[in-house]
Amino acid sequence: RRANAIAFDLREAGRIKREGDNISGKIIKDSNGNPLRQPGLFKNLKGIGWYIQEYGIAQISYNLTNINVTSLHDVFEKTCERATARGLRVTGSELIGLVPKKVLIDAGKYFLKKQSRSLAIPERDIIYIAVKTLGLDELQPFNQDERIIEYALKNKNNVLANMTLINFANKTSSESPAPGGGSISAYTGALGAALSTMVANLSANKRGWDDKW
């Protein structure tokens, strides 16, 4: 019942208005006798909660119908807040099916900002932060290549960026016209940018430099 109440707090459809207690209070109706509804906190969000007897835990299932309006991490954070207020604790979460990369990138950046950490880290590291903070690996390992749409669709066999350094060098030295000067210059530039970012990240997290963040 408490899990369902949390879902009602957040979902767009909200709950039926009642006098006093949200669960047992008298239903408030309009002039035509129809129950009035109290909207939830988030647009484009459907949700329901129930208790799973065999596991001894409550679960809330959400369906985000527009991730550009309502973000996964905002729903997670608010769920944790409402659960704590009811004496419950969120122990983890699970994604069903595949998820757009943007969802986890946005979540990872959000949590990094909360931790006052640099956002200038590799994309997969940002996603890792999201996975660990959201508890997406609570039930089973979260494989980025299998669970994120963009990674799952990528053809790894024909992408230069997925080559090892040795294979890339060997390919460059072959009779093939590509990779050529452009690829080498781009990679050299990327290494320079990565090194500069490393220095910035080391400085940003240096003890005594918190006020310079």
Describe the role of every protein-language-model region.
Residues 160-164, 190, 201:
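Acidic, low-complexity proline/glycine-rich segments
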Residues 1-167, 174-175:
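Long, contiguous binding/interaction regions
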Residues 51-54, 70, 178, 184, ...:
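A generic structural micro-environment signature
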Residues 205-213:
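A structural-propensity feature for long, helix-poor, extended segments
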Residues 100-102, 179, 209:
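A broad, structure-centric signal for solvent-exposed, well-ordered loop/edge residues
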Residues 1, 172-199:
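Conserved phosphate/anionic-ligand binding catalytic regions in large, soluble enzymes, centered on
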